[in-house]
Amino acid sequence: MLERLNFIENKYEELSNKISDPSVMANQKEWQKLCKEHADLEIIVNTYREYKKAQEDLESDKEMLKEESDKDLREMAQEEIKELTLKLEDLERELTILLLPKDPNDDKDVFIEIRAGAGGEEAALFASNLLRMYTRYAERKNWKVETMSLNATDIGGFKEVTVAIKGKGAYSRLKYESGVHRVQRVPDTESSGRIHTSTATVAVLPEVDDVDININANDLRIDVYRASGHGGQCVNTTDSAVRITHLPTGLVVTCQDEKSQLKNKEKAMKVLKARLFEAAEAERAASIAEDRKSQVGTGDRSERIRTYNYPQGRITDHRIGLTLYKLETFLDGDIDEVIEALVTEDQAEKMKDLGRVN
């Protein structure tokens, strides 16, 4: 590990010199690429330097203990040795995590697709609850939320809705939300007070660049039609809504949120690219994946990942067996406690995989 850390530190110094070179700065595209690479290495290098400083301090205290006869100074050195030993253990764990293979999509913006599942109108209302939860979470993170497409019901639910969330680290945090979400509650329309179970499916897709995926224009069928609002009523007198069908895969994306047909087409193309990229990544991952007990981070949508139980005020994440009794604040966007636990579990699995490889 130390050999790799020394290599990274040297690379960081090399990049520091390059990004301050006027001849490199003249090429803005190359300069921005180098700046990003430099920023990605910064936390590793700073942690490694802190680790080396702690090691030096530890050796210094050990030398003092050998040579010093003063009782108070010896006690002080012994106390510092204990503290530094613990600090070094913590820093070593931190460095191990920082050196784990990084998901190349972690820095990307995301699309979140929420679809009502089993449960009819109640499932559509739950989809609306999930949309609000992610919107509130994005607000806490100062991320931007943009509606891409929606299919609303008459009483405020969503059969399906897609939003774009833009902000630093959006995919790295939200990727764990892919899967089947289950709600247990008494619907407002239920006179007997019986608890119903409904589901909604969430898909989190990284926004992809044009260089990430290439789409042949001949593979697309683009239809335009008049946008409709709640209950199907027409809200536009021009054919501004767009439906794009990717013929080889059968994937269909619609967008009618904008008044402009061109803007709707641009939005729909972004979502289509993200879906095609996800499908390609899933196929690639499936071909090389090892058997893993946990599905944390894989985005397996066939798996029920979380239950929201209203009568008990409970949220249970089934992937890691974590239960919290804070349903109201959780649905108000306070979801970081669960996400942190999922990140930790994902890191632990990666460390196990690394151990098997080594």
From Swiss-Prot:
GO terms for MF: translation release factor activity, codon specific
Localization of this protein: Cytoplasm
Gene3D superfamilies in the cross-refs: 3.30.160.20, 3.30.70.1660, 6.10.140.1950
Post-translational modification (record): Methylated by PrmC. Methylation increases the termination efficiency of RF1.
InterPro entries: PCRF, Pep_chain_release_fac_I, Pep_chain_release_fac_I_sf, Prokaryotic/Mito_RF, RF-1
UniProt main location, coarse: cytoplasm
Record's keyword terms, sorted: Cytoplasm, Methylation, Protein biosynthesis
A GO cellular component annotation in the UniProt record: cytoplasm
Sequence positions bearing N5-methylglutamine: 233
Pfam families per record: PCRF, RF-1
HAMAP family, A to Z: Rel_fac_1 (MF_00093)
Family matches, as NCBIfam families: prfA, PRK00591.1
Annotated family: Belongs to the prokaryotic/mitochondrial release factor family.
Function noted in UniProt: Peptide chain release factor 1 directs the termination of translation in response to the peptide chain termination codons UAG and UAA.
Protein name per its UniProtKB record: Peptide chain release factor 1
